[in-house]
């Protein structure tokens, strides 16, 4: 049976949650393999809106198993809150539906404080972090001083590890607070230990060796869907560094972050909006600073799920999509929010860049070069029809069909899914990755 990775092909917020929710019908297991609660997936099912930050989107489907892999950094309080909220609404009736890797790393209060105060200290060169402690938690992981989910279940071990890490974190916080003129937050071992052992008890029924579970599912031929967070251009290695997140968002990390071998993955499906958005700092060649940009933001409800920050909006960037295809090995692409373009008289697609008088077809590796490029646009005619009721490709207005086909040509990736509204049902699935 094929196993499929769903990955963001832009700077995140592409609509991955909706596509994963749609494809979960055909999968048996859904895996989150990187990031933390800096990601937010918004799902609308039957007009009811659900926002998830850590638990995979497939949890809204009864009988599906959702896994939070070892590559995720977990804020236990946020996770417990999501579990409780889902149960109140009638989801997650069986605890066996959710597995948390015992090797996933944990976000502690000092991580969030360091994240916020470091960002404040950057001033005008701020990266745009969410302040959720994601980066500092990954930093501790790589420095081999991190605390994992398994440690929450052993109070003595947890105390030892908090005592080993907290003093250095407090020293840095004192320096940062002195620079900012702020009081130093009070962090003490007994309070942190009590809180996190309590959270560990709440999470204990869900904690497992996720790698062992998933390898067993692969052997049994289960269909597994890997749910990426953020997007390709936010990848710590392949994104617009340093304006990136702290994890690998590309498809290659799906195996590493879930504890499987790379041969377990069969197809990679990229997700792209019909236009482009970005949150926070960093280069954005097709960004619009005009009424059209404002219209895209308003009609697309482009405000961060996690932070509420307004997203920067611009035209679709074919150079970015070609790059995403290259580094992820895209089998196909879902084009989301096509309905947001309804009513625009003309549309533009960036097909290449101009850099220092030269035409550039590929994404520059240096973010300073990317900040200097000028987009080369191709203009297409728009459409006036509202398309939320469309359920087949042939029902789309002719100009909408031409737009989709041109996106395929510019990106080099077939469009296998088109989203025409926020609800799960407002989708045209042209090819099912689990069947074709």
Curated annotation (Swiss-Prot):
Pathway: Purine metabolism; AMP biosynthesis via de novo pathway; AMP from IMP: step 1/2. Disulfide bonds: none annotated. GTP binds at residues 12-18, 40-42, 311, 337-339, 419-421. Substrate binds at residues 305-311. It catalyses: IMP + L-aspartate + GTP = N(6)-(1,2-dicarboxyethyl)-AMP + GDP + phosphate + 2 H(+). The keyword Chloroplast does not apply. Its cofactor is Mg(2+). The keyword Nucleotide-binding applies. It is found in: Cytoplasm. One of its GO terms (molecular function) is magnesium ion binding. IMP binds at residues 13-16, 38-41, 130, 144, 230, 245, 309. CDD domains: AdSS. Its main location: cytoplasm. Keywords: Cytoplasm, GTP-binding, Ligase, Magnesium, Metal-binding, Nucleotide-binding, Purine biosynthesis. Belongs to the adenylosuccinate synthetase family. Homodimer. PANTHER family: ADENYLOSUCCINATE SYNTHETASE. This is Adenylosuccinate synthetase. It comes from Myxococcus xanthus (strain DK1622).
């Amino acid at each position: 049976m094929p196993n499929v990775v769903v990955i963001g092909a832009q700077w995140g917020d592409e609509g991955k949650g909706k596509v994963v929710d749609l494809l979960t019908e055909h999968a048996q297991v859904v895996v989150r393999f990187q990031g933390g609660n800096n990601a937010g997936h918004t799902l609308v099912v039957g007009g009811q809106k659900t926002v998830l930050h850590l638990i995979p989107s497939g949890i809204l489907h009864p009988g599906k198993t959702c896994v939070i892999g070892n590559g995720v950094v977990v804020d236990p309080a946020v996770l417990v809150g999501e579990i409780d909220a889902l149960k109140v609404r009638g989801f997650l009736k069986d605890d066996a539906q959710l597995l948390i890797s015992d090797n996933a790393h944990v976000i502690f209060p000092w991580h969030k404080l360091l994240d916020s105060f470091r960002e404040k200290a950057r001033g005008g060169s701020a990266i745009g972090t969410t302040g959720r402690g994601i980066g500092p938690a990954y930093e501790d992981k790589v420095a081999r001083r991190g605390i994992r989910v398994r440690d929450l279940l052993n109070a003595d071990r947890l105390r030892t590890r908090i005592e080993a890490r907290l003093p250095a974190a407090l020293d840095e916080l004192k320096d940062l607070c002195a620079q900012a003129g702020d009081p130093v937050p009070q962090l003490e071992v007994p309070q942190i230990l009590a809180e996190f052992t309590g959270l560990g008890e709440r999470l204990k029924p869900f904690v497992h060796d996720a790698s062992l579970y998933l390898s067993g599912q692969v052997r049994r031929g289960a269909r597994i869907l890997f749910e990426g967070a953020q997007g390709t251009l936010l990848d710590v290695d392949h994104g617009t560094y340093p304006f990136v997140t702290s994890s690998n968002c590309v498809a290659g990390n799906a195996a590493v972050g879930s504890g499987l071998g790379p041969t377990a993955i069969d197809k990679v499906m990229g997700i792209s909006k019909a236009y482009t958005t970005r949150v926070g700092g960093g280069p954005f060649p097709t960004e619009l600073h005009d009424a059209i940009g404002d219209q895209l933001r308003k009609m697309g409800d482009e405000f961060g799920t996690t932070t509420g920050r307004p997203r920067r909006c611009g035209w679709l960037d074919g150079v970015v999509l070609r790059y995403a295809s290259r580094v992820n090995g895209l089998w196909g692409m879902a084009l989301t929010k096509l309905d947001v373009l309804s009513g625009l008289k003309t549309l533009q697609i960036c097909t290449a860049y101009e850099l220092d008088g030269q035409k550039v077809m590929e994404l520059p590796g240096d973010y300073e070069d990317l900040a200097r490029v000028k987009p080369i646009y191709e203009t297409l005619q728009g459409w006036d029809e509202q398309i939320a009721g469309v359920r087949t490709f042939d029902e789309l207005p002719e100009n909408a069909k031409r737009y989709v086909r041109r996106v395929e040509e510019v990106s080099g990736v077939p469009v296998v899914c088109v989203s025409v509204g926020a609800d799960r049902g407002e989708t045209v699935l042209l090819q099912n990755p689990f069947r074709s």
